[in-house]
Amino acid sequence: MYRIKDLREDRDLNQAEIAKIIKTTQQQYSKIETGKSDISGEKLCLLAEFYNVSADYILGLTDELKPLK
């Protein structure tokens, strides 16, 4: 499962704010966050850059919270 909800909540942001960053609607972002819709590679990269974490961390493929270089 994606870790985007935890990342968002840790920064006290709402879904609409993140949706704007990844150029989508709040409704679509909500579907991504709840696993009802897949995230595109482009949106995944935008989130990784915004949160300064790896895409693997967001996708739950690693537990290492490594910042992007």
Regions found by a protein language model. Name each.
Residues 36-46, 65:
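Short, basic-rich loop-to-helix N-cap that marks the start of a DNA-contacting helix
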Residues 12-31:
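Short alpha-helical DNA-recognition segment
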Residues 10, 49, 59-69:
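Short, charged recognition helix plus adjacent turn
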Residues 23, 42-57:
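DNA major-groove recognition helix of helix-turn-helix/homeodomain DNA-binding modules
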Residues 1-10:
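A short, Lys/Arg-rich alpha-helix, primarily the initiator
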